[in-house]
Regions:
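Conserved Rossmann-fold NAD(P)-dependent oxidoreductase catalytic core, especially the SDR/UDP-sugar
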Residues: 112-154
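A short, basic/flexible loop-to-alpha-helix module at the beginning of a structural domain
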Residues: 1-11
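N-terminal Rossmann-fold cofactor-binding loop
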Residues: 40-45, 63
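N-terminal Rossmann NAD(P)H-binding glycine-rich loop of SDR-like oxidoreductase domains
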Residues: 12-34
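Short alpha-helix in the Rossmann-fold core of NAD(P)-dependent oxidoreductases
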Residues: 105-110, 126, 158-159
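NAD(P)H-binding glycine-rich loop region in Rossmannoid oxidoreductase-like domains
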Residues: 56, 60-105, 116, 134-136
Length: 171
C-alpha cells in the first residue's frame, strides 16, 4: 500500500476502488474537487491520469488480497472512515473464458471490501456491476434491478455473485 497524502479536511469523504481503471479514473477526474477521496488502484496514480491533489489520497493495492484490504480500511478507519464507497474495481479479460482472477478480484475482492468497510461509517455503498448479468430484453423493454439474471459468461457470473454478496450484506 502506497499513501500519497495524509490529512483529510472537513469535506465529505469517499472511497473509490478501481481508481486506476477506466471507469474509476474517469469518475475521479469528474469529482476530484468536491470530496476528500481515498482512491484505491493497482497502478500508480500518475499512470492512471488522476491528478495529484491534497484531497486525493492514493492507496495502491489489490482488492483480491484480503490483508491489503484490511490495511487500507484500517488506515481509513483511523482517519475517521468514509461516507460513501464507490466500488468500480473489477477484472475483465475480453476472452469470455474462465479465469481465476474473476473469482479473486470480482467475487472475493468485493466480499473482502464489504466485510472490511463495516467499521467505516459508510452511508452508501455503490457497486458498478455489468449489464451482462441481466437477460437481454426485447426492443423497447427497460432493464432494471428487477430484470431476470442470465449470466452466461464467466465475467457476468462473477459480477452476479458479487451482487449476491452485496445483497446478502445489506440484509
Amino acid at each position: 500500500m502506497t499513501v500519497s497524502s495524509a490529512t483529510p479536511p472537513h469535506k465529505t469523504r469517499i472511497l473509490v476502488t478501481g481508481a486506476s481503471g477506466f471507469v474509476g479514473s474517469h469518475f475521479l477526474r469528474t469529482i476530484k474537487d468536491d470530496y476528500y477521496i481515498y482512491a484505491v488502484g493497482r497502478r500508480k496514480q500518475h499512470a492512471s491520469g488522476v491528478p495529484v491533489q491534497e484531497n486525493i489520497e492514493w492507496l495502491r493495492g489489490d482488492l483480491g488480497d484480503e490483508a491489503t484490504v484490511q490495511r487500507i480500511t484500517e488506515h481509513i478507519a483511523l482517519e475517521g472512515g468514509v461516507d460513501y464507497v464507490f466500488h468500480f474495481a473489477g477484472f475483465y479479460d475480453f476472452t469470455n473464458r474462465d479465469n481465476p482472477e474473476y473469482t479473486r478480484t470480482n467475487i472475493d475482492g468485493t466480499r473482502f471490501l464489504l466485510e472490511n468497510c463495516l467499521n467505516l461509517g459508510v452511508q452508501r455503498f455503490v457497486f458498478a456491476s455489468s449489464l451482462t448479468v441481466t437477460r437481454f430484453s426485447k426492443k423497447d423493454i427497460k432493464v432494471t434491478e428487477k430484470s431476470p439474471v442470465d449470466a452466461t459468461i464467466p465475467y457476468a457470473r462473477s459480477k452476479q455473485a458479487a451482487e449476491e454478496i452485496l445483497t446478502a450484506g445489506r440484509e
